[in-house]
Design a protein with these regions (language model features):
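Peri-catalytic and regulatory segments of divalent metal-dependent proteins
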Residues: 18-129
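Sec-dependent signal peptide recognition
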Residues: 2-10
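C-terminal motif of bacterial Sec signal peptides marking the signal peptidase cleavage site
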Residues: 13-16
């Protein structure tokens, strides 16, 4: 019975194995990319509904400007490395929230949030990036 259970577990692990496109290393996928994207979009939308967006037009414009440059560079990189089909998984959004914490985060699919508390520590677009 143990041999059968061990064989079953081994088969499950092998079925979930795949190669990382860029590096070729092996990975075990317990959750599909689509499930991750769907879940992260739900979590992001829940967060954005409760977060207080910044009213500072200049700072918000800076976050969007830098974000668009990062998005373009990311998409160029994916295309140049044979992963153009991954670009469809991104629906870029850039938000500045009115929160004094020094923080920022991104979610799968191109959802980026910057906290206002981070901006006094940067003096240029390059530093924010």
């Amino acid at each position: 019975m143990r041999k059968i259970a061990s064989l079953f577990v081994a088969l499950l692990l092998l079925a979930g194995c795949s190669s990382v496109p860029l590096t070729g290393r092996k990975q075990v996928l317990l959750v599909s990319d689509q499930e991750v994207l769907s879940s992260s979009l739900t979590q992001y939308n829940d967060y954005i509904k409760t977060a207080k967006k910044s009213t500072n037009v200049n700072k918000s414009a800076m976050v969007t400007r830098v974000g668009k440059k990062i998005a373009a560079a990311t998409e160029d990189y994916l295309r140049a490395n044979g992963m153009a089909d991954e670009v469809k998984n991104f629906s870029w959004e850039f938000n500045l929230v009115n929160d004094p914490q020094v923080n920022a985060f991104c979610m799968p699919g191109g959802k980026i949030v910057v906290y206002e508390g981070l901006l006094p520590l940067v003096s240029s677009d390059d530093e924010l990036a």
